């Protein structure tokens, strides 16, 4: 999900909402490699690193056998969200499906923008601009978001 915001130049947008954002320390250090500047910016904006407990790690291993399309980092995210009662933010469809099966609330990039608009944090015009930027990012292969959902939100 963070890559979507990075690709359209709005890495700060989720932090305008009154939420706390966490990522497992392992995922952040090992897999989350868009750029060092992206990592630095996310930490400055307030992204927090979560240390995985032994129980969460064991649950992640269990999830790997149950949800074979998920990486270890995906199962860590699912395990942490489930154990701590957190909402999972992801655009990864297999992870979203596993979260739903596990009773974990899950949302993604488009939901974040819907929240920004609904809460009056961004204007209708800003929302329209961002939706257009996301559509363009999908067209150019920079983001993987459901085009139909984006076009539903686009003004005619």
Summary of predicted features, one role per range:
Residues 1-80, 84-86, 93, 104, ...:
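Active-site-proximal, substrate-binding regions of enzyme catalytic domains
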Residues 101-107:
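A short alpha->loop->secondary-structure connector
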Residues 96-97, 118:
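Mid-chain, well-packed structural core segment of small domains
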Residues 109-122:
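Long, charge-dense
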Residues 124, 129-143:
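A late-sequence structural motif
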Residues 91, 109, 126-127:
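Residue-level detector of family-conserved "landmark" positions at structurally sensitive sites
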